[in-house]
Amino acid sequence: VNKEDMWVSHIPVPVRAHASAHADDNFANYKDLNELTDWNLYSLQWAPVSLDGKWLVLQDKDLFDYARVERKIPATKELKVSFELMAEQNDKGLLQIEFLDENGIACSRLELTSDGLFRAKGGARFGNLLKYEPGKTYKVEVELSVANRMVTVYVDGKKAGQRMFFAPVPAIERVMFRTGAQRTYPTVDTPAD
């Protein structure tokens, strides 16, 4: 027997390639993760996803992986997304929020960093939106325009920043929350052992 991890999956059927309606989820209405049939969950032993009252909770102590939740939405060129966000700490960890096309290519990313910054990636650089406090709830509203390649972020009703998309996409079809940076290594050009 190999020492590799063994993965077991539960995939709801029928599998849907396209969403019929935009997300309008209130997590307080759910008692169990199995009820989140419109969400794709990547929950690990050391990076679990759970429900706690009105919150969908992502935790992470895994050095090599992350927790991830993703919601498929209808293909949209002008999108408004709103959610409440609270971090339990601001001195460790990373939360990334990405807006993706049908192929999983992100056009925009928001991050809560281990430096206590809430920032947005625009082009090749990041722009700081605000310093976030642990235990404080933030009402975040994000407006994305595929035609203008722009994202505008509002926090608690105030404009926090505007950034250009870092990748052009034909439409936005997914919203994703992840507790770590996307893995891009190894690549096809990585030398063999």
Annotate each PLM feature.
Residues 163-193:
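Flexible glycan-contacting loops in extracellular carbohydrate-active proteins
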Residues 154-158:
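Short strand-turn-strand beta-turns centered on an Asx-Gly dipeptide
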Residues 119-141:
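Short, aromatic/His-centered strand-loop micro-motif at the edge of beta-sheets
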Residues 13-41:
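Extracellular carbohydrate-recognition regions
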Residues 27, 81-83, 135-146, 151-153:
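Short tryptophan-centered beta-strand motifs in secreted/extracellular beta-sheet-rich domains
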Residues 50-121:
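Secretory/extracellular carbohydrate-interaction modules
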Residues 3-12:
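Structural motif
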